[in-house]
């Protein structure tokens, strides 16, 4: 069994125990998953909203833990909840009336960040949202294509296609940027 499969089994056991009321298991489950949940939400939404969205994800998960049966891995289950939280937030923001932007409220990037990290984030942000999501789940968070399909609610072939197209898009963007510089 791979390290990832062992870790997923451990997380699932923790979630099942937490669902039965084991507070120590709940604490261990949250600690073990919070980094992946935050990173996933930061890429789906924005880093500034990731804390609030992660909190909402865990609130929803806590309410649902007693009904979690372990048919999928707990990590897949939790990331599917995070995905729904992000989608709900986008729907909420689109439904709100647009008001003039206060320049002081605009999130300013931190100075001193490495150019490559900034460039990568710009390139990721330029991807189609479904392609970005599939790429992040498989390449950054390390989910299998099957697990990613479960999180996204689509066939595994669609996930493979989205990841392949995301890679092509990133490579094409990188080549264009190189040609502009050189």
Go through the PLM ranges and name each one.
Residues 52-59, 72-84:
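Structural recognition of an alpha-helix C-terminal capping motif at a helix-to-coil junction
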Residues 2-5, 17, 45, 122, ...:
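C-terminal edge and immediately downstream basic/flexible tail or linker adjoining helix-turn-helix-like DNA-binding
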Residues 30-48, 64, 124, 176:
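Amphipathic, Lys/Arg- and hydrophobic-enriched alpha-helical face
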Residues 125-133, 141-158:
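Helix-turn-helix DNA-binding module
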Residues 63-70, 80-101, 113, 165:
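Arg/Lys-rich amphipathic alpha helix in sigma70-family domain 2
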Residues 83, 87, 140, 152-177:
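DNA-recognition helix of helix-turn-helix
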Residues 2-4, 19-28, 38-56:
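Short, charged helix-capping/linker segments at alpha-helix termini
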Residues 4-11, 88, 94-122, 144:
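Internal acidic/polar
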């Amino acid at each position: 069994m791979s390290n990832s499969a062992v870790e997923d089994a451990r997380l699932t056991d923790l979630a099942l125990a937490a669902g039965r009321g084991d507070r120590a298991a709940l604490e261990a489950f949250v600690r073990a998953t919070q980094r992946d949940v935050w990173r996933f939400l930061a890429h789906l939404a924005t880093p500034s909203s990731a804390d609030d969205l992660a909190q909402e994800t865990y609130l929803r998960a806590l309410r649902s833990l007693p009904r979690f049966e372990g048919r999928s891995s707990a990590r897949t289950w939790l990331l599917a909840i995070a995905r729904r939280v992000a989608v709900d937030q986008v729907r909420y923001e689109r439904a709100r009336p647009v008001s003039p932007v206060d320049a002081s409220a605009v999130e300013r990037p931190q100075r001193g960040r490495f150019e490559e990290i900034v460039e990568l984030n710009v390139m990721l942000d330029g991807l189609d949202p479904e392609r970005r999501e599939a790429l992040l789940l498989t390449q950054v968070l390390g989910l299998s294509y099957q697990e990613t399909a479960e999180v996204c609610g689509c066939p595994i072939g669609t996930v493979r296609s989205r990841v392949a197209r995301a890679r092509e898009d990133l490579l094409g963007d990188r080549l264009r940027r190189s040609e502009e510089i050189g």
